[in-house]
Amino acid sequence: MREEDTVCVGSDGLQYCKVCGEAKEAFFPKCGFMGMKKHSRQCVCDRKAYEEEQKYFKDKEHWELVSRNTSICFDESRMEEWTFENADMSDAVMHKAKSYVDNWEEMKRNHIGCLFWGPVGTGKSFIAGCIANELLKHEVTVKMTNFNTTIDDIFPLADKTEYINALASYQLLIIDDLGVERNSEYALGIIFSVIDRRIRSGRPLIITTNLPLNEIKSETVLDKKRIYDRILEMCTPMYVGGASKREAIASMKMEKAKTLLNTNKGEECE
């Protein structure tokens, strides 16, 4: 729509918006300014359009930042689907995970982390991923990784301290599957350095592991014991039990495959 179609001139000589009826011009006080008697001003429509434009660019900047941080956080794109929206929120541990996010500022201020432990396949990584994705939406920097990846990344580096400091710099660090990595003296040394530096940074840490909590607490091997002691110093243990979700998913896929394959004539799948 052309501007002349939305503007009219009032009896006072000022331009008015035909839509909202508010003046689009105003008189300078007294003698004017540099020979001009009036100046432009925003009407209600102009102000609304400006606010919408500002919101658009602010939202665009926000989601671009979230997208960048998300790509840094996860090594696999499928983890971006690990969200509370896709979770069973009637689950007690999942509810606690959501509460952790809802109280993030207090958790961060008090350096409170979590240790999700329990049998294989019960959804510990998924829970940690839900926390990560929800915080990422609020522009919190998160890194979710595991020690096998960390050790492989660090091994060829001349300056290992820089890498470890980078892990410590994220507002939240999530270490997935503690205990599946190599148990060499070198590996345990790297693990301790990462955990120790993280704790000294004062920033929260979340760990997932298949190791039983009593095994973690009663570890006698010195190199492992000092790692576990540091973790328990910061992370609140939460048991994640129940049936294996991986087995349930595999069973569901098997039944789906049988249904699809048996639609064709011939020998049925067993």
Give the predicted meaning of each segment.
Residues M1-M94, I249-E270:
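A short, basic N-terminal segment
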Residues A23, E134-H138, R197:
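Active-site catalytic microenvironments for nucleophilic, acid-base chemistry
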